Amino acid sequence: MAKDNSWVFGIESTIFTIVEKRISEKLSDDYPDLYITNSDKNTDDPVFPTIYLHELPGSEQGNDLEGKDINAVMETFQVEVTSARSQQEAKKVLAEVLMVFKEMRFQITAMPEFKSGDETYRSIARCRRLIGASECDTLGNK
């Protein structure tokens, strides 16, 4: 009998919810206007600092002989922090986000890259982890 493979399609929202909750708890005093999103479009006025979590295409892992079930997925998230104040602020916020990913046993695969434009500063990193079918409910456990 095949398992319900719908867990795969909820990974992004599960990870987003965990990160949003933990980062809000850690940084709300220092950054009361902190904005966390997983959408690449925003029609509102920009709010800084902004954390953008982007799920990159994953790949199925751990196939069995029947091939009907998704047993695990290699997940990668790109984290982008944008600040209007300073590169230091972007680095500080990104460091906190990466520690949340480390608490969930993600590996940092692309260390922070720093970019600055005319009016903003960005810090970008990527995190990857193999997530098994039975793990989605326990990702938020420390």
Which residues does each predicted region cover?
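Small/polar-rich, solvent-exposed N-terminal microdomains that initiate assembly or binding
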Residues: 1-64
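Compositionally biased, intrinsically disordered low-complexity segments enriched in polar/Pro/Gly
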Residues: 1-6, 71, 135-142
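Hydrophobic beta-strand residues in large extracellular and virion-surface proteins
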Residues: 15, 19, 23, 34-36, ...
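A generic structural micro-feature
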Residues: 45-47, 68-73, 117-121
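Oligomerization/assembly interface segments of phage tail-like spikes and tubes
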Residues: 71-85, 121-132
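Acidic-leaning, charged glycine-interspersed low-complexity segments
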Residues: 92-142
